[in-house]
Amino acid sequence: MVAYLNIHTAYDLLNSSLKIEDAVRLAVSENVDALAITDTNVLYGFPKFYDACIANNIKPIFGMTIYVTNGLNTVETVVLAKNNDGLKDLYQLSSEIKMNSMENVSFELLQQFSSNLIIIFKNVADEHRDIVQVFDSHEDTYLDHQSVLVQGIKHVWIQNVCYQTRQDADTISALAAIRDNAKLDLIHDQEDFGAHFLTEKEIKQLDINQEYLTQVDVIAQKCNAELKYHQSLLPQYQTPNDESAKKYLWRVLVTQLKKLELNYDVYLERLKYEYKVITNMGFEDYFLIVSDLIHYAKTNDVMVGPGRGSSAGSLVSYLLGITTIDPIKFNLLFERFLNPERVTMPDIDIDFEDTRRERVIQYVQEKYGELHVSGIVTFGHLLARAVARDVGRIMGFDEVTLNEISSLIPHKLGITLDEAYQIDDFKKFVHRNHRHERWFSICKKLEGLPRHTSTHAAGIIINDHPLYEYAPLTKGDTGLLTQWTMTEAERIGLLKIDFLGLRNLSIIHQILIQVKKDLGINIDIEKIPFDDQKVFELLSQGDTTGIFQLESDGVRSVLKKLKPEHFEDIVAVTSLYRPGPMEEIPTYITRRHDPSKVQYLHPHLEPILKNTYGVIIYQEQIMQIASTFANFSYGEADILRRAMSKKNRAVLESERQHFIEGAKQNGYHEDISKQIFDLILKFADYGFPRAHAVSYSKIAYIMSFLKVHYPNYFYANILSNVIGSEKKTAQMIEEAKKQGITILPPNINESHWFYKPSQEGIYLSIGTIKGVGYQSVKVIVDERYQNGKFKDFFDFARRIPKRVKTRKLLEALILVGAFDAFGKTRSTLLQAIDQVLDGDLNIEQDGFLFDILTPKQMYEDKEELPDALISQYEKEYLGFYVSQHPVDKKFVAKQYLTIFKLSNAQNYKPILVQFDKVKQIRTKNGQNMAFVTLNDGIETLDGVIFPNQFKKYEELLSHNDLFIVSGKFDHRKQQRQLIINEIQTLATFEEQKLAFAKQIIIRNKSQIDMFEEMIKATKENANDVVLSFYDETIKQMTTLGYINQKDSMFNNFIQSFNPSDIRLI
C-alpha cells in the first residue's frame, strides 16, 4: 500500500498551502492508496478530508502533529488513530491542547492517550532519546527515516507535505510572512523546503531503505478509523421524578391547551398528530430542552422573539411557549417545519434581545456543564480582496499601491482574482512590471485558503456528554468552540440551536421597561390589539423609520401604495419585498384595491390564494395546492416544494409525473394538472415560509404600535441604538422633530449614556457629545445617583474628579447646552471655566471643608452667544443641530417662495443654504473653481462650482449671507453632490419671486375675505397673477381669481398667510 503519513493541509492555518481537494487529487494521480492528515495541534479538516478521500477511494487516516516535551527538549511527533477509540483520543488530546493554549505536549499527557494511537517521532537526535524511550514499550512507536537509531524502535519513511509542487515553495514563505506580520524577501525566502507532494517517479529516485517503506504499509493497514455521521446524540431532558420524556411532554402540552380559550377539539386533533410525529422521530427531548431554555429567558427578564423560521408552524412549539404564533389561527403547516416523510433534526432558531442573549447561554452552560456546551468555529479565508492586500503588504507595497489594488477589485460578493483579471485596468496593473506579476502569482496560489478562525454568530452545541467525545474543541474569544463548522457538527449528529441576538427585541424591551417606570403602564405585547387603525395609518404613510423589516425606502414605497388595512398585509409585504417575488408586488397591490381583478386558474385555488388575491406568496400555499389537487400528503408536498426549489431536472420530472397522476386520480383533467404544476413551479423558486413571515411581521407590528402610542420612548431607544453613527443619529433626530417630538439638549441632571425619553421630549445622550467618552459619562451619572442632582455648574465642577474634569470636557458640555437648566448663558459658563479649573477647585475634598476653605464662586454674566454660533457648536460637538439653525428658521419663514431642502430638492430647483466652506482651487487650464459645503440647517452636502459659474458668482461667495442655489445633482466617489449652476442671495431671490410670480396657491381660505376687493374674476392686465386654492382633502386645485402684483396691498396679502399655507409659483 502506497501511503503518505504526514500531510499538512491548509487547515494547519498559515503553515500549509495544500488544499484538501488538491492533496486528494494528487494522491489519485500518483496512485496513492492512503493519506494521513496531520495538521499541527488541530483537527479542523477531518470531515472535509474524510469526505474527499472516501469519494475518491483513498483510505483516510486521521492524525495530528504535536510537539512532545520532557521540559528540557522537544521533539516533533506525528500521532495517528488506529481505530475509532484512537479517533476519540485525538479529539480529546487536541481539545486539551487548544483549550489550554499549549504549544507543547508533555510526554505524560501523550501517555494518557497513547494506547490507540500510532506514535512517530521525527528528526530524533541524541538529546531526544529520553523522551522516545518513555514509549519504547508502546507497541506502535516509530521513528522517522531521519532519526538516530534507538534500540527496539523501528523506522518508517514519512514525508512532510505542505504544498503541491516545488514551484509552490514560495507559498510557505508568504504564509509565514502574513502570519508573523513580516516582509517577504523575494530573493532569500524562496528556498525549497522539500515539503511538496512527491510524485511516484520522485519517490523511486530516492534512496529509501526498503524496510522503512514496508513499515509505511504496516502502519497504513493498522489505521482503520472512520467518522460516524448522523449519530443519535440528542441529550436527554431531565424530567421531574424521572418521568419518561414522552409522558412528561404530553402532560405539559395537554395542561397548557386546557388553559387557553381555544376550540379544544380542533386543537387537540392537531396536537395529537404533531405529538405522534415528534415522538416517532424521537425528538421529545429536543422540544423539552428548547422549551426549558426559553422558559428560563422569559422568567429572567430576557425578551424572546415570537418565533423564527418554520418552527412557528408547530402547535407543540406554541403550547410550550417556544413561539407565540398560533399556527391554526394563521393557517401554518407543521410539515413545513417537521416532515414525517423526511426524517431530519428539527431546526428551531431562537431570537433573544441582543443585550441579554449571553444570560441564556450562561444558563445552558451552568445546566449542562462547561464541557457540554460550545459555540461553533467558522473560518475567515484569503479571498480575492484580502489576499491581494495581504500579499501586497508582505511584498512591501506602499499604501497608495495597496489602495489602488483595493479600488481595482470590484466590491462584489465572492469575486475571484480570475474574474478581476478580466477587467482591463486590473490586468494592466498585474503586468505593469515583474514585481506585480510575482505578486499576482503568489496571490493566486494563496487565494481561498483559510486564514483564521472566528465564532459562528449564533450556533450553540449542547450535549449531556463532554463534547470532546464526539468532536474536538478549541478556545474562542468568549468560550469553547467545536473545531468543526456548523454543518459538520450537525452531520455528526450533535444538537445545534441558534441563539440569535435581535436588536429590535432589545429596543422593544427597553420601551416597555421605561413606559412602566415613567408612566405606570404595563404593556403586555401579547394582548395589544392587532387591528389598531393608527398603526395602519402610520404604515400607509410609509412612516417606518426604525421599524423592523419595514424601514427600507423600497418597502416604504410599497406600503404607501398598498395602504395596509390588516395584519395580513404586513405579512404579505415582508414576504414579497425580495428579489424574485418583487415583480408580483404591482399585481398584488392592484388586486388588493380592486378584488374584481383577481383571477384563478381553477376555482379550487381560491380557498388557498384568497388572502393573497390570487398571488402565490408562501411556500405553504404550494404545499396546500399539491395536497388539494394531487392528493399529496403535506409531507409529500414539502418534498415536492424542496425538489422544485433545487431545480434537479431528474427529480423534477419524476415529481411532475407524480403530481399529474395524483391530480388525474383526484378527478382533474391532465391539461389543468400540468398548468397547475407549472404555476407552482414558477413560484416555488421564491416562495417565502409563511411561518417566518408571520413571526417577523408580529415584531414589525409591535414596534409600529409602540411608535404610534409612545413616540418619545420609541425614538429615544432607536437613537440609543445608533450612538456612534453621526449620520444615522442626525437622520433620526430630524425625523423625530418632524413628528413633533421635542429634542432636548443633553441635561447634566437628566441625561445618561443612552437617550432618555420623558413626557416633554427626548434628552440627548451625553455620550453623543464628541470628546466625552463612556468612562466620563459613567463617572458623572454615578456621582449623580450617589449624591443627588447637581445644584449648579460650580457644584458639578466640585464633585467631579480632577481626572475627568478637563477644559475640553467642560467646554463640550457647555456648548451643547448640558448646563442650560441652571439658567446661565453658555457664554457665562464658558467664562467660569477658569474659576473651576484653578488650584483650589482642583482639590478634591468634602463639601463642608470646601465651603469653608474656598471663596464663594461668582458668575460673571455675559450675553448669550449668537444663534448662528450656537448652531455651529452644536453641529461641531453633536453632528446635528438641537436648537433651530438660522437657515432652517429662515426656511420656515420663507417657504412660501417655493424653496426646497437638500433632502427633497430635485435638479435645478431653488434650495436655501449657507456656505459652510468654500475651497477655491485652480484647474490645469489655470481657471479658478471651488468646492463648497452647503448647509440647509438640517444636513450638509458637497457642491461644485465650475470655472464659468465661479467667475460669475465669485464676489457673492465672499459674503456671509443666506443663498438660494440650484443645479444638477450628481454622484462623486459614491457620494451625492450638487453641481451648482446658479447662486442668488435670499433677498434677491425673494424680490424677483414677488415681482415675477405667475401663480399664488393657497391651502387655507380663512384670510381671503379680508382681501375680497383685491381679487378679480378675470385677468385684466399682464400684472395679474392667478390665485388658486388647493384642497388637500380631495387633492384638487380650483381658481379663485386674479390679484394684481402692483397693488399696494399685494405684499400684505402674501404676509397675511402662514408661510406653510401659501406658495408663489
UniProtKB/Swiss-Prot annotation:
Superkingdom: Bacteria
Record key words, sorted: Cytoplasm, DNA replication, DNA-directed DNA polymerase, Nucleotidyltransferase, Transferase
Source lineage: Bacteria, Bacillati, Bacillota, Bacilli, Bacillales
UniProt cross-references to SMART domains, sorted A to Z: POLIIIAc (SM00481)
Descriptive protein name: DNA polymerase III subunit alpha
Subcellular compartments: Cytoplasm
SUPFAM superfamilies: PHP domain-like
Family: Belongs to the DNA polymerase type-C family. DnaE subfamily.
Annotated catalysed reactions: DNA(n) + a 2'-deoxyribonucleoside 5'-triphosphate = DNA(n+1) + diphosphate
Top EC class, one word: transferase
